[in-house]
């Protein structure tokens, strides 16, 4: 896949993880009692790249687990490319980790996004505010996708903590939700990973 800056994939992943760590640290200054656990699903990284990530996360509450492709061979339909299968397996593994290990809010993050330092604090505060106002859990996406403005769909603007949020009816794979919604819609999450 052609990238804007044409650097090796590790450069995007490293910068993404580093910006996420900074955002987590900022969030902890605002919510010192908030328990944040991060799990990285590694899909056969080269040893030198994995070592670089391990140095970055050393001493932080971050685990790395290796993706087991064989676990998903019977679940995921045969795909045109190994990369597509790997992406679906990684996504399924991430959803399973969220389902099995989370307690409250879950934030699924792709490895090529850069995060503003106050991003996580804004999401947690806005989630709490909006979910309280709506009296229900929700899905929250920190990314703004310009292609979502191309059609003329009805939308709502919600006031968050320090930013406004727009309702959408689709997202990619970076979003926050509750464990309750993950469980409630588990079949949908599974179906998302079975085939592309």
Task: Cite the ranges covered by each PLM segment.
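Short, flexible/disordered intra-domain loops and linkers
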Residues: 2-11, 76-83, 190-194
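Short beta-strand/loop segment that forms part of the nucleotide-sugar
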Residues: 30-45, 66-69
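Residue-level recognition of the N-termini of beta-strands and the immediately preceding loop/turn
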Residues: 34-38, 62, 104, 135-139
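Active-site-proximal specificity loops/subdomain of glycosyltransferases
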Residues: 46-103
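The conserved acidic donor/metal-binding loop of glycosyltransferases
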Residues: 111-114
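Short, acidic, metal-binding catalytic loop of nucleotide-sugar glycosyltransferases
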Residues: 4-34
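Conserved catalytic core of nucleotide-sugar-dependent glycosyltransferases
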Residues: 98, 105, 116-189
């Amino acid at each position: 896949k052609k990238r804007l800056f044409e650097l090796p994939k590790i450069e995007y992943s490293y910068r993404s993880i580093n910006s996420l760590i900074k955002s987590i640290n900022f969030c902890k200054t605002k919510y010192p009692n908030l328990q944040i656990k991060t799990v990285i699903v590694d899909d056969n990284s080269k040893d030198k790249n994995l070592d670089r990530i391990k140095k970055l996360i050393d001493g932080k509450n971050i685990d790395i687990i290796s993706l087991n492709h064989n676990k998903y061979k019977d679940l995921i339909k045969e795909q045109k490319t190994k990369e597509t299968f790997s992406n679906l397996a990684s996504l399924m593994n991430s959803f399973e980790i969220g389902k099995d290990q989370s307690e409250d809010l879950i934030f699924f993050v792709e490895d090529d996004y850069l995060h503003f330092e106050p991003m996580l604090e804004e999401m947690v505060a806005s989630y709490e505010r909006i979910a309280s106002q709506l009296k229900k859990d929700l899905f929250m996406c920190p990314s703004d996708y310009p292609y979502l403005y191309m059609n003329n769909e009805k939308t709502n603007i919600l006031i968050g903590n320090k930013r406004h949020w727009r309702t959408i009816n689709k997202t990619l794979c970076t979003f926050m939700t509750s464990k309750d919604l993950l469980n409630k819609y588990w079949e949908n999450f599974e179906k998302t990973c079975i085939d592309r």
